């Protein structure tokens, strides 16, 4: 073959036969068992996570990253511009891993957790401005310095990316389309999952008969930046906290700590599907749990595992 600009079937027949027999390989669970039927992880494809402020977008992304480090030894590079100082972000990750605040852990637990987080997480200096190219160049620099290969990257929030509108005649839609294309290419050539976290646009409030007003879940074309996200996305996830004044499809009122994970787009075929499932926040452990076959499961737990009980009393002393 003279070049790689195009392919005849004969160039890919071996790969085709392998794929037809085995399908997608190396598909991984997010560690949240209730999501496995609609959402799985596949390296080489980006994930876009959206939601309103205070919906838990960052928390959900951190949960996936902690889970995949525990389950598969995955390593992560994170830009988190709205998570406080770098030490605050590390504190959050340590709390998730320990399932209790760092200062409540004994010295042995602290050392073990520090080693785990140090081995698997690098946090970018969010006081610096990054274009998407500069961000991925920084990821490559860290890989070279630490002699590691990152399995995921995360840029949160998307609107912190340095805008280069002058290259696109001042058109934000063209700039956005180009950035999302670069993210797609980055995931593919690096065989990793590049995560972008985005806000939603303004959603019109709904008023119930009793006068109660609430914001419904945003549609896929109601993310900040518009339908370009929908067009460019592979996996598109909305994190939504339903109001307790509403009931779910089974007629049961939503719980105060309930979050709906809504898969609004799923590509490639075979790794998920459009749908939704609820997960529940345990503020004390800083982790999510869910239900599978009516059994309570924390992240990384399976049906046969021993179950911890969630902390849902928000007035309870932490420890």
Predicted regions and their residues:
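Signature of the SF2 helicase/ATPase Hel1-core->accessory helical subdomain module
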Residues: 160, 201-202
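Hydrophobic/aromatic beta-strand patches that form the interior of the parallel beta-sheet core
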Residues: 47-49, 77-79, 122-124, 195, ...
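Conserved inter-motif catalytic segment of the P-loop NTP-binding fold
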Residues: 30, 72-170, 178, 306-314, ...
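A short alpha/beta connector and helix-capping loop motif
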Residues: 167-183, 193-197, 244
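C-terminal regions of RecA-like/P-loop NTPase motor modules
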Residues: 1-14, 20-21, 53, 110-116, ...
């Amino acid at each position: 073959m003279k070049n790689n600009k195009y392919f005849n079937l004969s160039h890919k027949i071996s790969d085709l036969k392998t794929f037809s027999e085995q399908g997608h390989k190396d598909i991984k669970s997010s560690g949240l068992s209730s999501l496995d039927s609609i959402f799985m992880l596949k390296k080489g494809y980006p994930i876009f996570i959206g939601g309103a402020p205070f919906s838990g977008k960052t928390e959900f992304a951190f949960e996936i990253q902690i889970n995949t480090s525990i389950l598969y030894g995955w390593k992560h590079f994170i830009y988190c511009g709205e998570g406080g100082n770098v030490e605050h972000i590390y504190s959050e990750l340590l709390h998730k891993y320990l399932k209790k605040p760092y200062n409540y852990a004994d010295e042995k637990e602290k050392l073990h957790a520090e080693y785990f987080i140090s081995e698997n997480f690098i946090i970018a200096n969010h006081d610096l401005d990054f274009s998407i190219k500069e961000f991925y160049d920084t990821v490559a620099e860290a890989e070279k310095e630490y002699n590691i290969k990152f399995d995921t990257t995360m840029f949160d929030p998307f609107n912190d990316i340095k805008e280069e509108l002058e290259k696109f005649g001042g058109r934000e839609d063209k700039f956005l389309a180009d950035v999302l294309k670069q993210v797609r290419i980055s995931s593919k050539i690096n065989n990793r999952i590049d995560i972008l976290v985005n806000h939603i646009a303004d959603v019109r409030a709904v008023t119930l008969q009793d006068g109660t007003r609430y914001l419904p879940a945003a549609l896929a074309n109601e993310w900040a930046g518009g339908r370009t996200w929908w067009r460019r996305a592979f996996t598109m996830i909305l994190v939504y906290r339903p109001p307790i004044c509403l009931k779910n499809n089974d007629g049961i009122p939503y719980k105060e700590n309930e979050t709906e994970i809504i898969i609004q787009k799923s590509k490639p075929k075979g790794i998920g599907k459009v749908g939704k499932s609820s997960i529940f926040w345990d503020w004390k452990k800083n982790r999510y749990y869910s239900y599978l076959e009516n059994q309570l499961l924390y992240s990384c737990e399976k049906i046969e595992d021993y179950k911890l009980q969630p902390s849902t009393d928000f007035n309870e002393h932490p420890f």
